[in-house]
């Protein structure tokens, strides 16, 4: 099992349809995205299976091809939040043992003085030469337990900590999302308003699996008016947004675009009053998720219909356990615990 199979299958079904857009501009069809990813994968094999390949960039279309190329090469995708200080990035690169880091021109220039890892600039001549390599065969025998994504969280000690996510983990996340939250198809779009290093990027696999186009805002960041404009021009739009981003959409005073279908919110507290204002402005498009680095996007949540006529206690909660997930509160001895005092939460799933 290798996550590249999601792109492989979609390219076979929808090869000539648009796959990746930069704003409203078509960058790749599914067939051309597959070929470019396999060409990149061929060049990345020099680092060997299991090599950690980092990406540090503002949102840009190449992140999608890099993600699948890294998986096709049976390497590990290590995305870095582009908002981090370069010394924090270097700490992650060192901790991960990254063999290479692909960066935007801006981040590459800032990172170069402190990085001990080799830097390549996305879109530069060296990068494009990689994309001209002979295509690698699609992977067929990847161990599903092998790592696919090294997800760095803020941690509790002031130093980022990496959660190792396998191909099986991310496939389970993909199936869970499609079972519980959204039903995209080839006439749908995923708008990458939030950083692709985290929640928005984690949603690439489920939407690619259904042939939904990947839309990267031309600004490379979150601008509420640009986001809403993209939801007017692309079909069947879904997105992952932080609660603060949802609030900024409401502040525009604009009506809900006709093509906006789903906003999954998470990654921070959504206050009940803020959620009610968002629902009044945009209607029943909201889905809530609660997860963590070790169980990305996959612990609890509220579906769109769970928000309808729900009491404040439900709207202010983290929702219900997701399909295939068992959530419990345990005491120090691991037994079920009825008091919040000295308790810890436990999550189990079919990973």
Locations of regions flagged by a protein language model:
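Conserved structural elements of the adenylate-forming
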Residues: 33-39, 144, 163-185, 193, ...
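Conserved AMP-binding/adenylate-forming
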Residues: 26, 41-84
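Conserved pre-ATP/AMP-binding loop-to-beta segment of ANL
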Residues: 15-16, 134-152, 159, 183-189, ...
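ANL superfamily AMP-binding
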Residues: 17, 31-54, 84-86, 90, ...
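Conserved AMP-binding/adenylation subdomain of ANL enzymes
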Residues: 171-189, 199-237, 252
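ANL superfamily adenylate-forming
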Residues: 106-145, 159
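Gly/Ser/Thr-rich phosphate-binding loop
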Residues: 212, 236-240, 250-312, 326, ...
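AMP-dependent adenylate-forming
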Residues: 6-29
């Amino acid at each position: 099992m290798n996550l590249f199979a999601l792109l492989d299958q979609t390219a076979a079904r929808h090869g000539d349809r648009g796959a990746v857009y930069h704003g409203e501009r078509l960058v790749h069809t599914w067939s051309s995205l597959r070929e470019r990813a396999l060409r990149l994968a061929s060049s990345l094999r020099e680092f060997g299976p299991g090599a950690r390949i980092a990406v540090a960039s503002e949102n840009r279309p190449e992140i999608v091809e890099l993600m699948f190329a890294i998986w096709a090469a049976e390497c590990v995708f290590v995305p870095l939040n582009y908002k981090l200080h370069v010394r924090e990035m270097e700490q992650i690169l060192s901790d991960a043992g990254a063999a290479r880091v692909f960066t935007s021109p801006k981040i590459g220039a800032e990172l170069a003085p402190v990085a001990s890892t080799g830097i390549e600039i996305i879109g530069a001549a060296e990068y494009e030469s990689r994309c001209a390599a002979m295509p690698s065969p699609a992977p067929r025998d990847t161990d599903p337990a092998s790592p696919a994504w090294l997800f760095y969280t803020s941690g509790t000690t002031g130093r980022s900590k990496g959660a190792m996510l396998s191909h099986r983990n991310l496939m389970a996340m993909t199936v869970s999302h499609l079972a519980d939250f959204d039903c995209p198809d080839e006439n749908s779009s995923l708008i990458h308003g939030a950083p692709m290093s985290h929640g928005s990027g984690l949603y690439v696999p489920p939407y690619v699996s259904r042939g939904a186009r990947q839309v990267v805002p031309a600004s490379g960041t979150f601008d509420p008016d640009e986001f809403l404009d993209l939801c007017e021009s692309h079909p069947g739009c879904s997105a992952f947004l932080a609660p603060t981003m949802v609030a900024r959409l409401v502040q525009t005073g604009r009506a809900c675009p006709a093509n906006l279908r789903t906003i999954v919110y998470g990654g921070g507290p959504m206050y009940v009053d803020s959620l009610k204002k968002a629902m009044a402005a945009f209607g029943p498009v909201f889905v809530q998720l609660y997860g963590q680095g070790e169980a990305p996007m996959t612990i609890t949540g509220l579906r769109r219909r769970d928000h309808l006529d729900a009491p404040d206690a439900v709207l202010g909660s983290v929702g219900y356990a997701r399909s295939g997930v068992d959530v419990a509160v345990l005491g120090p001895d691991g037994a079920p615990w009825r008091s919040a005092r000295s308790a810890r939460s436990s999550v189990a799933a079919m990973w």
